[in-house]
Amino acid sequence: MCLAHANSAPQVQQVPGYFLQPVGNLKVTALFDGELGLPRSDLLGISSEKANQLFAQNFIPVDEHNHILTDFSAYLVQTPTQNILIDAGTAKCFGPSLGYVRENLKKAGVRPEQIDTILVTHAHPDHLCGITLDGKMAYPNAKVYLAKADVDYWTSTLNEAKANDFFKPLFKMARDALKPYQQAGRLVAFTQASFKVPNVEVIATQGHTEGHTSYLVDGKNGQKFLGLGDVVHYAAVQFPYPEASYKPDTDARRAIAVRKDIFEQAYQKQWWIGAAHVSFPGIGHIGKNTQGYQWIPAQYRLLK
């Protein structure tokens, strides 16, 4: 036995927070942004007893407040001609346990200036704040795409004045994140009819926010990848019980209908999914079992 090895300090760092999954001719890389506890009380439409049973059965970790520890991820999608980022993470908007997308992008071998397109699913800080770094464009060569409905709503001072204490700070965060791209003419506030990005189709998934959008990227040969956004927050519960909703949803009824519809589409069409709040890397498929829908995570594979 080598005493030098026996007495050396143990490894205390986690492996880099990225995971590469080929999808047809795409290279999809999950980028870990961090983790945060979501309150159990924000899960609605299901009894607390049933929800807690599902959390326990799935060994879901909790934080010091007994909140459900939830992963936050963004997705790099590389086509033969594009470097697309689906969501950009939190940056400094939500504290030290989040904000690692840009760092993990670089660890994955891609420089921020190589990103040409950022597709933001919605204007909440954990998806939007990361486009900006210290008041400047964090991705200086990228165009940012965000649904016009979300741009209009989350930059409005009138809506800000009417918002409750939970949502009120999010308006300034959205304006600050978007500002440098607006000033540079690099923000595209799109409608479903006006959206034009090669190889990408928008799927309207409103409910969580006014303009929430999922992005379906064509990997050819029948392979497609869906950047889902916030259709799911509590995976252990909302896959088998998609009628369970999340308190901050703008329109819970619509969010539930969207969740059921997109789960069925993804199941029938066998799309690859990138789910921002499913356990990292959040890449996999949606299947079915006797309870309902189920999450089937991607397997770690050798790259060829």
Kindly label every feature range from the protein language model:
Residues 16, 123-130, 195, 209-212, ...:
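Active-site environment of divalent metal-dependent phosphoester hydrolases
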Residues 216-304:
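Cap/insert and terminal regions of metallo-dependent hydrolase folds
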Residues 73-74, 96-145:
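Active-site metal-binding motif and surrounding structural segment of the metallo-beta-lactamase
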Residues 3-102, 106-110, 114-117, 148-204, 222-229, ...:
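Metallo-beta-lactamase
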Residues 25, 77, 87, 115, ...:
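Divalent metal-coordination and catalytic microenvironments
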Residues 33-34, 88-91, 123, 149-150, ...:
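Active-site metal-binding loops of divalent metal-dependent hydrolases
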Residues 95, 153-156, 235-239:
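Short acidic/His/Gly/Ser-rich catalytic and metal-binding motifs that mark active-site loops
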